[in-house]
Each structure stands twice: as structure tokens, then as C-alpha cells.
Amino acid sequence: MPGLTIGDTVPNLELDSTHGKIRIHDYVGDGYAIIFSHPADFTPVCTTEMAAMAGYAKEFEKRGVKLLGISCDDVESHRQWTKDVEAYGGKQQQQQATTTKVTFPILADPARDAIRQLNMVDPDEKDAAGRSMPSRALHVVGPDKAVKLSFLYPATTGRNMDEVLRAVDSLLTAAKHGGKVATPANWKPGECAVIAPGVSDEEARKMFPQGFETADLPSKKGYLRFTKV
């Protein structure tokens, strides 16, 4: 379905949240932010997801990435539900002797207008009143307020926060090097990145004094070049 996608500017909506009124562009500020929706409060998969996101919040904070949740429940519902989220997350963290706290705001969109503008509507899910429900959507928004990456999951599939964090690390790595590098399949921080096709070998030698390795492939085109970044 058409809607907000990579490269589009996220709409500058103002909504009530668990932290008061929030205007999205002001919240994103000069850094990165993750805006993620969940179908409904007090539901099983959403509770595990929100607890997982809360558990990863410090990792995102280390990277200068803010978190912003949203669903169609009201603010009071969010506040009551986060007690369950924190209790569940705390039980999962007992072995690490840590606690789970939802420190980031959750937006309330009972009118469903924001989830439509953010392209977060699940076409297959309705509530008891027949109203639209959010999908498990996630947008990573950059300092320019444009969408850099999107995930879209159905209600039946919880998101993997390790993959969200890995994808954010990939975006930040590419941005740090001006788009001159990209990350290959299954990449993890600390592993080699690949040099963008538009970078000549001569330019690559200047940009990456640590050197690079070109994969020996049948085509002999020399396009697959790995370097430590």
C-alpha cells in the first residue's frame, strides 16, 4: 500500500504521549530516532516487544538514537500497561540483576490519523469496533527528518531487537563514512564493510589507508571490496 517510505520526510505530527505533548520533528532533533508502532496495549506479543525495546534502550542511547512508541490506545492505557511491561521485562532480566523501565514516550493516537500518515496501518487487523489497528511497523528517522529504514511486521510476528540494533549500526556506519561504504549480508559491528561501487580504487586507497581486499570473482570486475572501518 502506498505511503511513507525510505527517503520521505516523516510528518511533523503533534500528539499526546506518556511524557506529555510531543511534536515529532522536535523530538527527533538533530539526531536519529526510532518510531515504532504496536497493535494494542495489554496484548501478549506487544508486551514482549515493548519489554525488549525497553531492555535495549540504553544501547540505542549510547548511539544517540531516541525511541518513540505509538499505538491507538490512550495515554492512561499506556501508563497502566507499562507496569505490566516493566514487570515482565524485570522477570526476564533477573539473571542479569537489572530492571526494565520504559523510559521513552509512547504516543497516543485514538483517532488513527497518525498511524495512517506514518504508514503503520495493518490492513488485516481490526479492533472489536471494526477500527483500524497498527501493524508492527518501525521507522528509523535521520537528523534530516527523513525515513532511513523501515520494518513492517504483521501482528503475528514479534520484532527482533538484535536486528533493529544491527540495522541502526549499519546506518550509522554508512553515514559516518559519507555513504562511501555499505554493510554486507549478516554484517555485525567490527566486521568488514564493503566499499561503494562509485568509489574508485585510487580514491579507496586514500580514504582507507588501512587497505582493502578485493574478492576474486569469475567476472574479474573488482567490484566487491572489503575494508575495516
From Swiss-Prot:
InterPro entries tied to this protein: AhpC/TSA, Peroxiredoxin_AhpC-typ, Peroxiredoxin_C, PRX_1cys, Thioredoxin-like_sf, Thioredoxin_domain
Keywords: Antioxidant, Cytoplasm, Nucleus, Oxidoreductase, Peroxidase, Redox-active center
Pfam families (alphabetical): 1-cysPrx_C, AhpC-TSA
One Gene Ontology biological process: defense response to fungus
Enzyme active site: C46 (cysteine sulfenic acid (-soh) intermediate)
Localization per Swiss-Prot or TrEMBL: Nucleus; Cytoplasm
Catalytic activity: a hydroperoxide + [thioredoxin]-dithiol = an alcohol + [thioredoxin]-disulfide + H2O
Main subcellular location of this protein, as a coarse class: nucleus
Span of domain Thioredoxin: 4-173
EC top class, as a word: oxidoreductase
Motif (Bipartite nuclear localization signal): 205-228
GO MF, any single term: peroxidase activity
The EC number(s) this enzyme carries: 1.11.1.24
GO cellular component terms attached to this protein's record: cytoplasm; nucleus
Family: Belongs to the peroxiredoxin family. Prx6 subfamily.
Chain's role: Thiol-specific peroxidase that catalyzes the reduction of hydrogen peroxide and organic hydroperoxides to water and alcohols, respectively. Seems to contribute to the inhibition of germination during stress.
Entries under PANTHER family matching the protein: MCG48959-RELATED, PEROXIREDOXIN-6
Other facts: The active site is a conserved redox-active cysteine residue, the peroxidatic cysteine (C(P)), which makes the nucleophilic attack on the peroxide substrate. The peroxide oxidizes the C(P)-SH to cysteine sulfenic acid (C(P)-SOH), which then reacts with another cysteine residue, the resolving cysteine (C(R)), to form a disulfide bridge. The disulfide is subsequently reduced by an appropriate electron donor to complete the catalytic cycle. In this 1-Cys peroxiredoxin, no C(R) is present and C(P) instead forms a disulfide with a cysteine from another protein or with a small thiol molecule.
Protein name stated in the entry: 1-Cys peroxiredoxin PER1
Organism: Zea mays
Gene symbol of the encoding locus: PER1
